[in-house]
Curated annotation (Swiss-Prot):
This is RNA-binding protein Hfq. GO terms for biological process: regulation of DNA-templated transcription; regulation of RNA stability; regulation of translation, ncRNA-mediated. It comes from Methylorubrum extorquens (strain PA1). The gene is hfq. Belongs to the Hfq family. One of its GO terms (cellular component) is cytosol. Gene3D superfamilies: 2.30.30.100. It comes from the Bacteria.
């Protein structure tokens, strides 16, 4: 597989925003908007913290996750051709 990454993209993304305490907006499939910082996650849920309170959010209920600022997970591939 390409590079045999130890983690999948989802885990890499969640771990990055957790370690860097990046504020997120999470939209659920029912349209509810949640905001906070990821403090923990596993295969099934995400623990979101805001204003001293934690919310356990099941991943199957999540539609979209938007970080508060741009996130770069991987180094740019220098061998890839540049897009014009």
């Amino acid at each position: 597989m390409a590079g045999e990454r130890a983690q999948n993209l989802q885990d890499t993304f969640l771990n990055h925003v957790r370690k860097n305490k990046i504020p997120l907006t999470i939209f659920l499939v029912n349209g509810v908007k949640l905001q906070g910082v990821v403090t923990w996650f596993d295969n099934f849920c995400v623990l979101l913290r805001r204003d001293g309170h934690s919310q356990l959010v099941y991943k199957h209920a999540i539609s979209t996750i938007m970080p508060g600022h741009p996130v770069q997970l991987f180094e740019p591939d220098e061998t890839a051709p540049e897009k014009a």
